[in-house]
C-alpha cells in the first residue's frame, strides 16, 4: 500500500509538473489564438476554394506561407521590442492599411468598379502569386480580429510576464497556433469535399458556375465590410474632430512633472490673467530636467493672444511672471509640423475615455497609469517578480548601476541567496533569544533584590538629535516610535525664516542640491537676452537675497562676505529699477565666486553638474474641455468663445423669462442693445427621460469602442453594460428574489396581535391605492411625452397640429356652438344669451407654454418651439351651458358638476385631438354634456307633477271617508265630552291648591340653597305614558283617576328623595376650580349657571302670586279649554281629536306638577345632555386607556387581588364620586391645548377663549367652596393634566413635558410604615415588576388617590413602594422578556407590534448590526420619546431580602466585542428625589420642527437624529454596543439612609453628542468624590481632545434658563463639527413639485401690469406656496431646515481609528467562537499592572478572554517582556525557521495541545487557548495595521483588499500554522482576508 501510494503520488506530481510546464501552457494559449478569426482568413479561404490547377496550387501554398509568416511575425513582436513598437503603434498600422486597401480595390476593379469577372486578368498576371502572399502577410499584421474578440490573442502577451523562459513559451505558443490552424484548414477541406460530392450541388452545373463567378465579388464585399469596421474602430485622421488646445507646453506637450519630495516649497504666485500655479516660483524649488524651457499659457486679453511667461527670478536668474503681448504669432505653419503630427494627433481622444476633471491640475489627467510595476525582488531568499514594486526604487537602482563603477554585476544563484537569507534569519533569531534569556535573568535578579521591575524591562529606543544636550525628536517625528505617537509630518519652508537653527536643519537635509542648481542657470543666460530690461520687486528681492547670504554663511562654515545686507541697498526706497541683465549676472557670479572657494582659493566647481531627481510623471491631456452645461451657463470665461467638446446628456433649455419681451409697449432702450450680454434669459435645463447614449464621451472619439450597452425597457433612463446588470436595482418583473416579501409577511405575522391593529387600515390602504394610481398615471404621462420627444419629426408635426387645433377651437368651433345654441333658444321661445356666451368666450385665453408647461406670453412662442416642443394652455376654458341664470330660475336645483373642478383648476391643456387635459400629456377629462342638465330638469319637473296629482287624489278620498264617519257619531261624541269635562271641573274645585303648591315651594327652597346641581348626572327624564283610549266605556270611573294620581305622587316622592340625597352629599363640600376675581366679564360657563338660578328666583316670587290666584287661574284655564274644544270639534277629524286629547292628558299632568322644580329639572336635563355629549369622547378615551393598559397577566400573583385587574372605568367612577373631580373640568383640560393655538377658532367668542385659556375655574367666586384638597388630589390632577392633550385614537398614557412624576409621588410615600415583613405581605412587588413602566406609575397614582385614607396592610390597598424610605419605583431589569435593547423596559409606546416588547436580544445573539426595521413605528403619531429614555435604574428594591453584591443587567452573552468604551466608576446615593432623568441626545425636548428625511423610514421624527447618527458611522455602533456601560460603585455609609453596596450598571445609549448633562452633575460628583473617593477610569478609543470634550459635557450641569441652554447648544454644535465636518444638504423630495409649481406661477406673474392683484388671487387659490417663498434676503440655514426646505444628512466618513479600535473591528467580527462572555464581567478587574506581584500582571489585550475568577488571565508568555517590535520579529523568525521548512515550527507556544501544561487550563478551555495562540501569533495588542504592512511589503500587494490566501502559498510554513490554529479554534479560513478588508 505504501509503495502504491508512493507511485501514485509521483504520478500526480509528474502530471502537475507537465501541465504547469512552459511548453504545455504555450501550446494551450497558442491553440486558443486560432479561434480569433480575422480578415486574413478570407484570403486564405479564397485561395483554397477558388483556385484550381497548377496555378491554384501555387496560390494555395503562397497564401498559407504568407499567413503563417505573418502570424510568426506577430509572435516574434511579442518578444522583440522594436518590432512590437513598429507593429503596435496605431499610426503605423493605419499607414500600412489605407494605401494597401486602395491598391487592392483598384487591382481587382481596374476596368469597372464593382464589376467582377472570373476570366478577366490584368497585365500584371505574373505577380499574382506574390500578391496573394502579400495579402495574407499584411492582413495578418493588421491585427484586426472579428470573432469572438481580440482578447484571445492578448492572452499570449499577458502570460509572457509570468514565465521565465520566454523564447520557449513563444515557440510553443506558435506551435500550438500552427496545430490549431492545420486542424482548421483540414476542417475546411472536408467541407469542400462534402460540397463537391453532394449530388444535388453537382447535378446543378449552372449553380456551380454562378457560385464560382460571384465568389470574388462576395470576398471583396466581405473584405470591404471588415475594413470599414476596422476604420470605424480607429477613425481616420482627416474626418475626426480637432480639439482646440488651450495650452501649448514647451516642456512636454502631454505630460507634466509632479515632483515627489518630502517638503512643499514655495508659494503660489497668482498673477493677473493666470490660472495655473507656477511650477517653479521660489528660490529652492525642484529643478526641471531642461531649465531652458519656459512655460507659456495662452489667455485672451482684449481679443489679442496674451502669453504669460515665467522667467527665472533673481537668485535663479529669473524674474517674476509678467504679461507680454506678442506682436507675432508663434503658431507653426502646417508644413513646418511633422507629417505624423498632421495625420495622427496622439493627444486626441482616440478612445472613448471620459474627461476626468481634477481640481489640483488645470488639465485632465490621462487615465492610463497602471498600478502595477513589475520588477524582481528578493523574498524568502529567492528572487521573485513583484508586480507592485515601487517605480522610484527601480529607477534609483538603475541609476546606481550606471553611475557606480564598483557595483558588482555578478548574480548570485538562488541557493546562495536562500542560504544567506536563512543564515541571517537564524542569527537574528539567536540574538533575540539570547536577549530574551538575559532579560529573564535580570528579572529574576530584580525580584530577588526587590528592585523595580520596570527598570529591567526593555525600553523603547528614541532618536536623539543632540547628544550633548540629550534632546530627542518629538514623538510625532520619531521614526522608532509607532502607533498613536506617530503622525503625519507636514514640513513647510518659508522664505521669511531667518533662524539659524532652522537653517541648519534644512542644510542637513540636502540644500546643497539646490545650490548646485544655481550653476545650471548661469550657462543659459544667453537665451533671455532678447529682453534686456526686467522689472524687479524690491521687497521680494531683498528678502530672498538676505536669506541667500545667510544660507551661504552657514554652508561655508564662516562668514565669507563682509556685506551687511541690512545696509546694502540694491534698489532705492519705494521705486522700481530696471537693471541690465549683464550687471545682474556679474553680481551674482561675484557672490558665487566669493563663497564657493576653498582656503587654497581653488574653485570647487567650475562647470554645472546636472543632478537627476526621481520624479513621477503624470500624463495630462493638453486640452481643457467643457460640456454643454458649462457652455450654457457660461461661467468659465474661456468657455465663452469655444464650443462644448463633451457630449453630455441630451437636454433642453426651458425658457422662463425673456428680457426682450418685458416691455410690452414696444419701447426699447438704446442702452439695452449695448448690454445684451448682461441681460441673459432666465431658463431651466430639462433632461429627457430617455437612454443616454452620449455618456459624456468627447467629440471625435471612437464611439464604436465603447462598452456594449443594452436597453430592455421602452423608456430607460440609463444605458447599462451587460456585465453590470446584476448590480443595478431590478425591476419588479425581473426580480427573482422571492424570499424578501415572504420574509416581511412572516415578520408581520409573527409580531402582530389583534389588540394592536391599526384602526385606519382601510383608509391607509385606500390612500396607498390612490398614490399608486397617481404614480401610474404620471408614468404613463411621462412615457407619452418621451415618445413625442424621441421621434425625429414628431415635435414639428405636433406643434403645428396644436396651433391649428387652438385656432379651430377659438375661432370656429366655439363661435359656431354659441350660434347654434342661441338659435335653438329662439326656436323654443326663450330669450337668447348672446351677451353671456360671448363674455365667457372672450374670457377663454390660449397661452403658449414650453414643453414642460411653463407658460409664456399670450402671443409669444417659445424659442425653438418646433424642435423642443410646445404646449397650449387654455385659461378659463369655455363651457357651453343651456342657461346662465340657473340659480334664480331653477331654485338651485341645477348644480354644475364642473363647478368644483373649475374652482380648483380653471385651466387645462390642449391635446392634439382637440381634447382637454389637466396636465400635459395627461388623459383627456370628461366633457360636460350640454343636454344633461336639461334632461335632469325635465325629470325633476315630471316627478313633482306626479306627486301633486297623487296627493290631491289621496286627500280627497280620505276626507270623504272622514266626513262620513264623523257625521254619524258627532252628536253622541259631543255629549260624552261635555259630561267628562264637568266631572273634571268638580274634582279640581274640591282640591286645596295651597297645599299642593306649598310642598313644591319647600322643595324648591332646598334646591336653591345648594346652587351647584349643574354638573350632576341625574337620570330623571320625563316618562311619557301612552295615551288613553278615549272611546273606552270605563273612562268615567273614579278608581282609574285615583290610580293615576297615586302613580304620579309616587314618582314625585322618589324624585324628591333623590334630590335630597344629592343635596346632602353636596353639603359636605366638593372641589370647585377657581375663577379669576379680577375679571370684569363673567365667563361663559358662569352665565350658563346664572340663567337657571335667576329662573328659580323668579319662579319663587311668582309662586306666592299663583297661590292666591290659583282658583281664578284654574277656572279661567278650564273655560278657555271648553271654548277651544267646541271651536275645534267642528273642524277637525277624529284623528286630530285623539291627538288633542293626548295633549290634554299631558297638560293635566303638567298642571298637577305646577312647580318651578320641574322647570329646574328640565333645565338640568338639558344641561346634562350637553355634558353627556361632550363626555362621550372622554368615555371613549377612557375605553382606549382601559384597552391599552389592561390584558396584563401576572403569573407570579399569589393572592386573588391584582390591581391590574381593576377596570379603569371603575377608577374614573370612583374619581367622579369623590370630591374635587368632575368631568367638565377634565374635558376643559383636554381642550386647553386646542385653544392655545393662535391660528384656529378665530371666530369664537371672547368669553369662551377666556374660559379655556384663563385659570381653571368653573363656578362663580361666590359659589366657590373653601375646602382645600389634600396632596393626593393635586397629585392626581397634575398627572391627568399631562394626558388630555393627546389626540391619539389608541394612545397610551405617556407623560408630557414638565412633569416629573417620580419626584412627585415620592412625597406621598409614607416613610413611617417600615414593616420588615412588607416583602411577604406585598405580593404586588413581584407582580408589578413585569408591568410596563408608564402603567405602573399610573396605577400607583390612581390607587393612591382613591384609597389614600386606607393605607393599611390589606393586600389590595397596600402600595408596593410605600414601605422603603428613600426608595424609587422598582423595575425588574433582569426579566426574561423581549425588550427593545433591554433598555425600554416595556414602556408603553403606542405603535408596538407586540404586547411585550420588540427584540429578544438574549435569544438572538447573532445580530451584528443595528437593524432599524425593529423600530416599526408610525410617522403619523408623534410620541414623547422621554418615556422610554428615562433610565431610572435600581437593583433589588427590597433591602431585607437576600442582597446580591453585583446586580448587573445581563443583556446578552456577547462574544468579546465591548472593549473600547468608557467606564465611569462613581459612588452615588440611592435617593430617588435627587436622581435626574438621563437625557439622551436632547430627546426630552419635543422636536416639533424636525424634518423627516425619508418618509419610508418606519419610525418617529424623533428617531431621525438616532438614524443620522447611525448613518454616520454604522460600523462604529453595532447592535449590542449602542449601550454605553456606566459602572457606578455605591458604597455603604451612614446610619439613617442605608445604602446598598455593589456596582449598579447603567446601560445608556452612546450618543455622538455625548449629552450626559442631566445625569451627571458637577456639584454632585465633586461632593461624592470628596466623601467616598471616586475612581474614574476611561478606557476608550477617543482621542485626547474628544475625551476632554466628553468629560466637560458629562460633568456640566444643565440649567433651565435660556441663556445656558443656548450656550450648551452652541458647544454641542461645535463639538459635532469637530468630529463630523462632512454633511450634505439636500432638497426635500416633496418640495420638488411645489417648487416647480411656484416657478410656473412666477413665470406668469413676471409680465402683468396689475401684479399685486393677480399675486393675491393666486395666493388665495393656493397656487403659490408662501412657505417656499424666500422673502428674506439672507436666509439662515436653521430656518431653511425648520421650514423643511433643506435637510442635513451626513456623509459617510473615512474615520481614522487607533490600533485598539482596528483590533476590535477585525477580531470582534471574525472570531466568532464558542466561549462567549457577558458584558457584566468586562470591567471588573482593578488595574493593568500590579507592581508588587509580577504574577498578577495583566496585559491590556488579554481582557478579551481572561478568566476572571482567577488572576491567571492568559497563557503566560515570556515574549511579552520584549518590546512589541522585537517580539514581532522573534515570532516571524520562528515561524520561518529554515531548519523546519517541512514541519511544524519548534515553538513552545505553537506546539500541540498535549505539550502545553499549565495549571490554568482544562479541557473546556481548548478553544480559548487556541484563540490565545492565534492572538500571540498575529501581533501583540492585535495591532493589525502591522499585519497590513506585512501584507504590503511581504506579499507584494499595494492594496490590502487584494490580499488572499493564495499568496500565502509562497510561505508554506506560515500557511500550515495558520490552518492548524484556525481549524482548532473553529474560525473560518478566510479570516485574514476578512480582517484586512475591515482595516
UniProtKB/Swiss-Prot annotation:
Keywords: Chloroplast, Membrane, Plastid, Plastid inner membrane, Protein transport, Transmembrane, Transmembrane helix, Transport. The chain crosses the membrane at residues 18-38, 67-87, 90-110, 127-147, 175-195, 218-238. GO terms for cellular component: chloroplast inner membrane. The keyword Plastid applies. It is a multi-pass membrane protein. Residues 243-291 are annotated as: Disordered. Part of the Tic complex. Involved in protein precursor import into chloroplasts. May be part of an intermediate translocation complex acting as a protein-conducting channel at the inner envelope. This is Protein TIC 214. It comes from Morus indica (Mulberry). The gene is TIC214.
Amino acid at each position: 500500500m505504501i509503495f502504491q501510494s508512493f507511485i501514485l503520488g509521483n504520478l500526480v506530481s509528474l502530471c502537475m509538473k507537465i501541465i504547469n510546464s512552459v511548453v504545455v501552457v504555450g501550446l494551450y494559449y497558442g491553440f486558443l489564438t486560432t479561434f480569433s478569426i480575422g480578415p486574413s482568413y478570407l484570403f486564405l479561404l479564397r485561395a483554397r476554394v477558388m483556385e484550381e490547377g497548377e496555378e491554384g496550387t501555387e496560390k494555395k501554398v503562397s497564401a498559407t506561407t504568407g499567413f503563417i509568416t505573418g502570424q510568426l511575425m506577430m509572435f516574434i513582436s511579442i518578444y522583440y521590442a522594436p518590432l512590437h513598437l513598429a507593429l503596435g503603434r496605431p499610426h503605423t498600422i493605419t499607414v500600412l492599411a489605407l494605401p494597401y486597401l486602395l491598391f487592392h480595390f483598384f487591382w481587382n476593379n481596374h476596368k469597372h468598379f464593382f464589376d467582377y469577372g472570373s476570366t478577366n486578368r490584368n497585365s500584371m498576371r505574373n505577380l499574382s502569386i506574390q500578391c496573394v502572399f502579400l495579402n495574407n502577410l499584411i492582413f495578418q499584421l493588421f491585427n484586426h480580429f472579428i470573432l469572438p474578440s481580440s482578447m484571445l490573442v492578448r492572452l499570449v502577451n499577458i502570460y509572457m510576464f509570468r514565465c521565465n523562459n520566454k523564447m520557449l513559451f513563444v515557440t510553443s505558443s506558435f506551435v500550438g497556433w500552427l496545430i490549431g490552424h492545420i486542424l482548421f484548414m483540414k476542417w475546411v477541406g472536408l467541407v469542400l469535399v462534402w460540397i463537391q460530392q453532394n449530388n444535388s450541388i453537382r447535378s446543378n452545373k449552372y449553380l456551380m458556375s454562378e457560385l464560382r463567378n460571384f465568389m470574388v465579388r462576395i470576398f471583396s464585399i466581405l473584405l470591404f465590410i471588415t475594413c470599414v469596421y476596422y476604420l470605424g474602430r480607429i477613425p481616420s485622421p482627416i474626418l475626426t474632430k480637432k480639439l482646440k488646445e488651450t495650452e501649448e507646453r514647451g516642456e512636454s506637450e502631454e505630460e507634466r512633472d509632479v515632483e515627489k519630495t518630502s517638503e512643499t516649497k514655495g508659494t503660489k504666485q497668482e498673477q493677473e490673467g493666470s490660472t495655473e500655479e507656477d511650477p517653479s516660483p521660489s528660490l529652492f524649488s525642484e529643478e526641471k530636467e531642461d531649465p531652458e524651457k519656459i512655460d507659456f499659457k495662452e489667455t485672451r486679453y482684449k481679443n489679442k493672444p496674451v502669453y504669460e511667461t515665467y522667467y527665472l527670478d533673481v537668485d535663479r536668474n529669473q524674474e517674476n511672471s509678467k504679461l507680454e503681448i506678442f506682436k507675432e504669432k508663434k503658431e507653426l505653419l502646417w508644413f513646418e509640423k511633422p507629417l505624423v503630427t498632421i495625420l495622427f494627433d496622439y493627444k486626441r481622444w482616440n478612445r472613448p475615455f471620459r474627461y476626468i476633471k481634477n481640481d489640483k491640475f488645470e488639465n485632465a489627467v490621462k487615465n492610463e497609469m497602471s498600478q502595477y510595476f513589475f520588477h524582481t525582488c528578493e523574498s524568502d531568499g529567492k528572487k521573485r517578480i513583484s508586480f507592485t514594486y515601487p517605480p522610484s526604487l527601480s529607477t534609483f537602482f538603475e541609476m546606481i548601476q550606471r553611475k557606480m563603477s564598483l557595483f558588482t554585476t555578478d548574480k548570485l544563484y538562488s541557493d546562495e541567496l536562500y542560504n544567506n537569507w536563512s543564515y541571517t534569519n537564524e542569527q537574528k533569531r539567536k540574538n533575540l533569544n539570547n536577549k530574551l534569556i538575559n532579560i529573564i535573568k535580570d528579572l529574576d535578579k530584580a525580584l530577588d533584590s526587590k528592585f523595580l521591575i520596570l527598570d529591567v524591562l526593555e525600553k523603547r529606543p528614541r532618536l536623539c538629535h543632540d547628544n550633548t544636550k540629550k534632546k530627542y525628536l518629538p514623538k510625532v517625528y520619531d521614526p522608532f516610535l509607532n502607533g498613536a505617537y506617530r503622525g503625519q509630518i507636514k514640513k513647510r519652508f518659508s522664505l521669511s525664516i531667518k533662524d539659524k537653527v532652522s537653517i541648519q536643519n534644512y542644510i542637513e537635509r540636502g540644500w546643497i542640491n539646490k545650490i548646485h542648481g544655481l550653476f545650471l542657470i548661469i550657462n543659459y543666460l544667453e537665451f533671455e537676452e532678447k529682453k534686456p530690461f526686467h522689472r524687479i520687486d524690491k521687497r521680494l528681492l531683498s528678502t530672498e537675497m538676505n536669506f541667500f547670504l545667510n544660507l551661504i554663511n552657514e554652508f561655508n562654515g564662516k562668514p565669507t562676505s563682509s556685506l551687511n545686507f541690512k545696509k546694502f541697498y540694491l534698489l532705492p526706497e519705494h521705486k522700481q529699477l530696471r537693471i541690465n541683465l549683464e550687471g545682474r549676472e556679474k553680481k551674482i557670479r561675484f557672490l558665487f565666486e566669493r563663497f564657493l572657494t576653498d582656503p587654497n582659493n581653488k574653485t570647487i566647481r567650475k562647470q554645472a553638474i546636472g543632478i537627476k531627481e526621481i520624479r513621477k510623471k503624470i500624463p495630462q491631456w493638453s486640452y481643457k474641455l467643457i460640456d454643454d452645461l458649462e457652455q450654457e451657463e457660461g461661467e468659465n470665461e474661456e468657455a465663452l468663445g469655444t464650443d462644448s467638446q463633451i457630449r453630455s446628456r441630451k437636454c433642453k433649455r426651458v425658457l422662463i423669462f425673456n428680457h426682450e419681451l418685458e416691455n410690452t409697449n414696444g419701447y426699447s432702450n438704446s442702452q439695452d442693445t449695448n448690454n445684451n450680454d448682461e441681460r441673459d434669459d432666465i431658463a431651466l435645463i430639462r433632461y429627457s427621460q430617455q437612454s443616454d447614449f452620449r455618456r459624456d464621451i468627447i467629440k471625435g472619439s471612437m464611439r464604436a469602442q465603447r462598452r456594449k450597452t443594452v436597453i430592455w425597457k421602452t423608456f430607460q433612463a440609463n444605458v447599462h453594460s451587460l456585465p453590470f446588470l446584476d448590480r443595478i436595482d431590478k425591476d419588479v418583473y425581473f426580480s427573482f428574489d422571492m424570499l424578501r416579501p415572504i420574509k416581511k409577511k412572516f415578520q408581520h405575522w409573527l409580531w402582530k396581535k389583534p389588540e394592536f391593529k391599526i384602526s385606519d387600515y382601510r383608509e391607509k390602504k385606500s390612500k396607498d391605492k390612490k398614490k399608486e394610481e397617481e404614480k401610474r398615471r404620471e408614468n404613463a404621462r411621462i412615457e407619452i411625452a418621451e415618445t413625442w420627444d424621441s421621434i425625429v419629426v414628431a415635435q414639428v408635426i405636433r406643434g403645428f397640429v396644436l396651433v391649428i387645433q387652438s385656432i379651430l377651437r377659438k375661432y370656429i368651433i366655439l363661435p359656431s356652438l354659441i350660434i347654434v345654441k342661441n338659435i335653438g333658444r329662439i326656436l323654443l321661445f326663450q330669450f337668447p344669451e348672446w351677451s353671456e356666451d360671448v363674455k365667457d368666450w372672450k374670457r377663454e385665453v390660449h397661452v403658449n407654454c414650453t414643453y414642460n408647461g411653463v407658460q409664456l406670453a399670450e402671443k409669444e412662442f417659445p424659442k425653438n418651439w418646433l424642435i423642443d416642443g410646445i404646449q397650449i394652455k387654455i385659461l378659463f376654458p369655455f363651457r357651453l351651458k343651456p342657461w346662465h341664470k340657473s340659480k334664480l330660475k331653477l331654485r338651485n336645483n341645477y348644480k354644475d358638476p364642473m363647478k368644483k373642478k373649475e374652482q380648483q383648476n380653471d385651466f387645462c391643456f390642449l391635446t392634439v385631438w382637440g381634447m382637454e387635459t389637466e396636465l400635459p400629456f395627461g388623459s383627456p377629462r370628461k366633457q360636460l354634456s350640454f343636454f344633461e342638465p336639461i334632461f335632469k330638469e325635465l325629470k325633476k319637473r315630471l316627478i313633482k307633477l306626479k306627486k301633486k296629482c297623487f296627493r290631491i287624489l289621496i286627500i280627497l278620498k280620505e276626507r270623504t271617508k272622514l266626513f262620513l264617519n264623523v257625521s254619524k257619531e258627532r252628536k253622541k261624541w259631543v255629549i260624552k265630552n261635555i259630561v267628562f269635562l264637568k266631572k273634571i271641573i268638580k274634582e279640581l274645585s274640591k282640591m286645596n291648591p295651597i297645599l299642593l303648591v306649598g310642598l313644591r315651594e319647600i322643595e324648591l327652597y332646598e334646591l336653591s340653597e345648594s346652587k351647584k346641581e349643574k354638573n350632576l348626572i341625574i337620570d330623571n327624564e320625563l316618562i311619557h305614558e301612552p295615551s288613553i283610549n278615549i272611546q273606552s266605556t270605563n273612562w268615567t270611573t273614579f278608581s282609574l283617576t285615583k290610580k293615576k294620581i297615586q302613580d304620579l305622587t309616587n314618582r314625585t316622592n322618589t324624585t324628591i328623595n333623590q334630590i335630597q340625597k344629592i343635596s346632602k352629599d353636596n353639603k359636605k363640600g366638593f372641589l370647585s376650580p377657581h375663577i379669576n376675581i379680577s375679571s370684569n366679564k363673567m365667563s361663559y360657563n358662569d352665565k350658563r349657571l346664572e340663567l337657571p338660578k335667576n329662573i328659580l328666583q323668579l319662579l319663587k316670587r311668582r309662586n306666592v302670586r299663583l297661590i292666591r290666584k290659583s282658583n281664578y287661574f284654574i277656572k279661567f284655564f278650564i273655560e278657555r279649554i271648553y271654548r277651544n274644544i267646541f271651536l275645534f270639534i267642528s273642524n277637525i277629524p277624529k284623528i286630530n281629536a285623539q291627538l288633542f286629547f293626548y295633549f290634554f292628558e299631558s297638560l293635566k299632568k303638567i298642571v298637577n306638577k305646577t312647580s318651578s322644580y320641574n322647570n329646574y329639572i328640565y333645565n338640568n336635563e338639558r344641561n346634562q345632555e350637553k355634558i353627556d355629549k361632550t363626555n362621550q369622547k372622554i368615555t371613549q378615551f377612557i375605553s382606549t386607556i382601559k384597552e391599552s393598559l389592561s390584558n396584563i397577566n401576572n403569573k407570579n400573583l399569589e393572592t386573588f387581588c391584582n390591581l391590574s385587574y381593576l377596570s379603569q372605568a371603575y377608577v374614573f367612577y370612583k374619581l367622579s364620586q369623590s370630591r374635587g373631580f368632575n368631568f367638565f373640568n377634565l374635558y376643559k383640560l383636554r381642550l386647553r391645548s386646542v385653544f392655545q393655538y393662535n391660528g384656529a377658532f378665530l371666530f369664537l367668542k371672547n368669553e369662551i377663549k377666556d374660559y379655556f385659556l384663563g385659570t381653571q375655574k368653573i363656578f362663580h367666586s361666590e359659589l366657590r367652596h373653601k375646602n382645600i384638597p389634600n396632596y393626593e388630589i393635586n397629585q392626581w390632577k397634575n398627572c391627568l393634566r399631562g394626558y388630555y392633550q393627546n389626540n391619539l385614537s389608541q394612545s397610551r398614557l405617556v407623560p408630557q413635558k414638565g412633569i416629573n412624576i417620580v419626584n412627585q409621588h415620592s412625597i406621598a410615600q409614607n416613610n413611617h410604615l417600615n414593616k420588615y415583613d412588607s416583602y411577604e405581605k406585598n405580593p404586588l412587588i413581584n407582580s408589578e415588576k413585569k408591568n410596563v413602566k408608564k402603567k405602573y406609575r399610573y396605577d400607583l397614582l390612581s390607587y393612591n388617590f382613591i384609597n389614600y385614607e386606607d393605607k393599611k396592610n390589606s393586600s389590595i390597598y397596600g402600595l408596593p413602594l410605600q414601605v422603603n424610605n428613600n426608595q424609587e419605583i422598582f423595575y425588574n431589569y433582569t426579566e426574561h422578556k423581549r425588550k427593545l435593547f433591554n433598555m425600554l423596559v416595556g414602556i408603553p409606546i403606542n405603535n408596538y407590534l407586540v404586547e411585550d416588547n420588540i427584540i429578544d436580544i438574549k435569544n438572538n445573539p447573532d445580530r451584528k448590526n443595528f437593524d432599524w426595521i425593529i423600530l416599526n413605528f408610525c410617522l403619523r403619531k408623534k410620541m414623547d420619546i422621554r418615556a422610554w429614555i428615562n433610565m431610572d435604574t435600581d437593583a433589588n428594591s427590597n433591602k431585607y431580602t437576600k442582597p446580591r453584591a453585583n446586580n448587573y443587567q445581563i443583556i446578552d452573552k456577547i462574544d468579546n466585542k465591548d472593549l473600547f468604551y468608557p467606564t465611569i466608576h462613581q459612588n452615588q446615593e440611592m435617593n430617588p428625589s435627587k436622581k435626574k432623568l438621563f437625557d439622551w441626545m436632547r430627546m426630552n425636548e419635543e422636536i416639533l420642527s424636525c424634518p423627516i428625511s425619508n418618509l419610508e423610514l418606519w419610525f418617529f421624527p424623533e428617531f431621525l437624529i438616532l438614524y443620522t447618527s447611525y448613518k454616520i458611522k454604522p460600523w462604529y455602533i453595532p447592535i449590542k454596543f449602542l449601550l454605553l456601560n456606566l459602572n457606578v460603585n455605591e458604597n455603604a455609609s451612614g446610619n439613617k439612609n442605608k445604602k446598598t453596596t455593589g456596582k449598579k450598571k447603567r446601560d445608556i445609549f452612546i450618543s455622538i453628542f455625548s449629552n450626559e448633562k442631566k445625569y451627571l452633575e458637577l456639584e454632585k460628583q465633586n461632593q461624592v468624590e470628596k466623601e467616598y473617593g471616586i475612581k474614574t477610569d476611561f478606557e476608550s478609543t477617543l482621542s485626547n481632545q474628544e475625551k476632554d470634550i466628553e468629560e466637560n459635557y458629562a460633568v456640566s450641569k444643565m440649567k433651565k434658563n435660556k441663556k445656558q441652554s443656548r450656550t450648551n447648544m452652541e458647544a454641542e454644535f461645535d463639538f459635532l463639527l469637530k468630529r463630523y465636518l462632512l454633511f450634505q444638504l439636500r432638497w426635500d423630495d416633496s418640495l420638488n413639485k411645489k417648487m416647480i409649481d411656484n416657478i410656473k406661477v412666477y413665470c406668469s406673474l413676471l409680465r402683468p401690469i396689475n401684479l399685486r392683484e393677480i399675486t393675491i388671487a393666486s395666493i388665495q387659490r393656493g397656487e403659490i406656496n408662501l412657505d417656499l417663498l424666500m422673502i428674506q434676503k439672507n436666509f439662515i440655514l436653521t430656518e431653511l431646515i425648520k421650514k423643511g426646505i433643506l435637510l442635513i444628512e451626513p456623509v459617510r466618513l473615512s474615520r481614522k481609528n487607533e490600533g485598539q479600535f482596528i483590533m476590535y473591528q477585525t477580531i470582534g467580527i471574525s472570531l466568532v467562537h464558542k466561549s462567549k462572555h457577558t458584558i457584566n464581567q468586562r470591567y471588573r478587574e482593578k488595574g493593568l499592572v500590579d507592581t508588587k506581584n509580577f504574577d498578577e500582571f495583566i496585559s491590556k489585550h488579554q481582557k478579551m478572554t481572561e478568566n476572571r475568577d482567577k488572576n491567571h488571565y492568559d497563557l503566560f508568555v515570556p515574549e511579552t517582556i520584549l518590546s512589541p517590535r522585537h517580539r514581532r520579529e522573534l515570532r516571524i523568525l520562528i515561524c520561518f525557521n529554515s531548519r523546519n521548512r517541512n514541519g511544524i515550527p519548534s515553538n513552545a507556544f505553537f506546539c500541540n495541545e498535549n505539550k502545553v501544561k499549565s495549571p490554568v487550563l482544562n479541557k473546556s478551555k481548548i478553544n480559548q487557548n487556541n484563540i490565545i495562540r492565534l492572538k500571540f501569533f498575529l501581533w501583540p495588542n492585535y495591532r493589525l495595521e502591522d499585519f497590513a504592512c506585512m501584507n504590503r511589503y511581504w506579499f507584494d500587494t499595494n492594496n490590502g483588499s487584494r490580499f488572499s490566501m493564495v499568496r500565502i502559498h509562497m510561505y508554506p510554513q506560515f500557511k500550515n500554522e495558520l490552518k492548524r490554529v484556525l481549524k482548532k479554534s473553529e474560525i473560518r479560513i478566510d479570516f485574514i482576508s476578512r480582517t484586512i478588508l475591515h482595516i
